């Protein structure tokens, strides 16, 4: 009698726009090593403020650009001089486009790197107070844009209330979960199966649920609007009881592990952020739902 090891179904690395950092986590002249898309990378911001995501290994002798040794190193990362990142090993300098622009001890630029793009870089955009990188396994240019949300970029809404998880699953599992209303009753304890109106426009998916929501003061008509643009960027807007906007971001670390970021914002009342009560309860409920989904995702095949 033989036994057979059951392995998780192999799913490819998805392509799209993915969050690699919150904007306020990366100051000018800072850098850090990151690992996304099953690759070692370095994320840095130039002195002028441009965010850059680049292959991590110097083409000279393979030093990691994201691990610096000098006082002028970025926080936990490589040294930034002007717009360039500097290799900690022999101080080769690389532009935001991945071109070697200086070998300080050489009279002439080595032919291997002269006038060439030596390191792969990723298309970057910043909106919703997030740094987004475009990943495609074949290096294709972006096929759609990151959706900018007025709420996420407005001072009339609260600062982001952020939550983060590392989950051993694949982005497709999470996408399928969002389109599976039947599990809400059994996993999340809802009284019934939610019904959604869904529209599709290329990579953009939008959903709408309108319902009467019970409150201590009686029923209140409310709505939940959802949307996504590819596997990396999703949003949910709750209206009715406690207006809440959720920016949900899923970024593949490798083929079996993702980083999930939730950023909640709520409208200010007379310039102030209303805390506690229903406002806090709705956020706790959503975070709790992810915690309920997590063990199922992590142990699926």
PLM features: residue spans?
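Hydrophobic, proline/glycine-rich low-complexity stretches
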Residues: 1-16
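A general structural signal for short secondary-structure junctions and capping/turn motifs
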Residues: 9-10, 33, 123-125, 250-252, ...
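A short, structural micro-pattern
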Residues: 14, 118, 125-127, 244, ...
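Short Pro/Gly-enriched beta-strand edge/turn motifs at strand-loop
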Residues: 14-19, 23-27, 102-108, 178-181, ...
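Short, acidic/polar N-cap/turn motifs at the starts of alpha helices
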Residues: 17, 29-33, 40-41, 121, ...
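Rieske [2Fe-2S] iron-sulfur-binding domain
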Residues: 22-151
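C-terminal catalytic domain of Rieske-type non-heme iron oxygenases
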Residues: 50, 139-301
């Amino acid at each position: 009698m033989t036994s057979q090891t059951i392995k998780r179904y192999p799913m490819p690395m998805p392509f799209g726009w993915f969050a690699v950092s919150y904007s306020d986590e990366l100051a000018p002249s800072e850098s850090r090593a990151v690992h996304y898309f099953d690759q070692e990378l370095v994320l840095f911001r130039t002195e002028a403020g441009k965010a850059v995501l680049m292959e991590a290994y110097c083409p000279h002798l393979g030093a990691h650009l994201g691990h610096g040794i000098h006082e002028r190193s970025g926080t936990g990362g490589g040294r930034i001089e002007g717009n360039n990142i500097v290799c900690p090993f022999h101080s080769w300098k690389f532009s935001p486009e991945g071109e070697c622009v200086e070998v300080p001890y050489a009279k002439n630029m080595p032919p291997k790197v002269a006038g060439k793009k030596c390191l792969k870089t990723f298309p970057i955009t910043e909106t919703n107070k997030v740094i987004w990188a475009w990943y495609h396994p074949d290096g294709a240019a972006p096929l759609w844009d990151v959706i900018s949300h007025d709420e996420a970029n407005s001072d009339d809404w609260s600062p982001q209330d952020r939550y983060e998880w590392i989950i051993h699953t694949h982005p497709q599992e999470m996408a399928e979960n969002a389109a599976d209303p039947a599990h809400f009753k059994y996993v999340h304890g809802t009284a019934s199966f939610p019904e959604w109106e869904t529209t599709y426009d290329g990579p953009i998916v939008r959903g709408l649920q309108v319902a009467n929501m019970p409150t201590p003061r009686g029923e209140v008509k409310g709505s939940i609007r959802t949307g996504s643009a590819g596997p990396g960027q999703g949003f949910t807007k709750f209206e009715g009881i406690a207006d809440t906007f959720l920016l949900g971001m899923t970024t593949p670390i490798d083929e079996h592990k993702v980083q999930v970021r939730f950023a909640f914002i709520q409208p200010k009342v007379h310039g102030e952020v209303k805390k506690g009560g229903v406002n806090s309860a709705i956020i706790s409920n959503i975070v709790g739902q992810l915690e309920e989904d997590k063990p199922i995702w992590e142990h699926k095949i």
